[in-house]
Regions:
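Cross-family detector of peptidyl-prolyl cis-trans isomerase
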Residues: 2-288
Length: 288
């Protein structure tokens, strides 16, 4: 009996020692695991995420580089990148240039009346389902308060329509949410635009190119522009159309591996539908 007790005590002592060693090893592994996870989160949190960089090549003028700010206007940035990646801007013009104010481009019609289609975003749609689209205006007057960018020299912002000037004061929301593909680059500060248009980036190289474009010879416009960077200047006879075309030969975007996706699209406002809904007049029947 004494021999058994002695053996049992020794066995228990060895087992306890082994258990302590296992516990220590387990604790070391847990600490290492927690440390690794914590470092991973720290690295992710502190890792510099580069903003997308736009390279805009303008024929006979040079290259403009812009940094986009997705944290300020995510839908606007997503929209611009998707259009650029699908070659939408290649070959379009700066169709509206106002010295001391801005240069405007990105219209498929080349006169301010065009709109992008869903297919221009790289969305796979059937021909009979492809349609013009617009995006929500990411600025204060439209209920969006995360965009704190100001319309300073070098800022790129979205042009939009102002139906309140042309048709009815009731069309404020439709006006605010009418931007599609047209953009403008500020050549001077203009605080009157703050809170009413969606700035989403800034020129970081080639501001001299922007100013050279700003100084080209211009003539009176031949048509009213549906999308503008200044509603008070959207009527015809504004002297802002370049005598010689200023062509955007190519636009590329370096996203540094980040996928900015596609923007949430809205249906464009339709004048004929609005007239019918408001006044009960079907103008479509008079179209040829």
């Amino acid at each position: 009996m004494a021999i058994f007790d002695r053996f049992t005590k020794k066995g228990r002592k060895k087992m306890k020692k082994a258990s302590n060693i296992i516990t220590i090893i387990a604790l070391v592994l847990i600490v290492a695991l927690i440390g690794g996870i914590s470092y991973g989160y720290y690295k992710k949190a502190t890792m510099e995420v580069k903003n997308p960089i736009v390279t805009m090549e303008v024929q006979d003028f040079g290259t403009i580089k812009l940094e986009l700010y997705p944290e300020m206007a995510p839908q606007t940035v997503s929209n611009f990148i998707a259009l650029a990646q699908n070659g939408f801007y290649d070959g379009l013009k700066f169709h509206r240039i106002v010295e001391g104010f801005m240069i405007q481009g990105g219209d498929s019609n080349g006169d301010g009346t065009g709109a992008p289609k869903l297919s221009n975003l790289g969305i796979d749609v059937k021909d009979d389902e492809d349609r013009d689209y617009c995006i929500k205006g990411e600025f204060l007057s439209n209920g969006y308060n995360k965009n704190t960018l100001k319309h300073k020299e070098g800022i790129i912002s979205m042009a939009r329509a102002d139906y309140t000037q042309q048709y009815s004061k009731s069309l404020t929301t439709e006006s605010y949410n009418s931007a599609g593909s047209q953009f403008f680059i500020m050549t001077a500060d203009n605080s009157s635009l703050d809170g009413y248009y969606a700035p989403f980036g800034k020129v970081i190289e080639g501001m001299d190119v922007v100013h050279n474009i700003e100084n080209v010879e211009v003539k009176e416009t031949e048509t009213s522009s549906s999308s503008s960077s200044d509603s008070s200047k959207s009527e015809s006879k504004e002297k802002s159309t370049p005598v010689n075309d200023v062509i955007i030969s190519k636009v590329t975007v370096e996203t540094y591996g980040i996928d900015y996706g596609k923007p949430d699209t809205l249906e464009t406002w339709n004048y004929y539908d609005w007239v019918y809904k408001t006044y009960g007049i079907n103008l479509k029947q008079y179209q040829q």
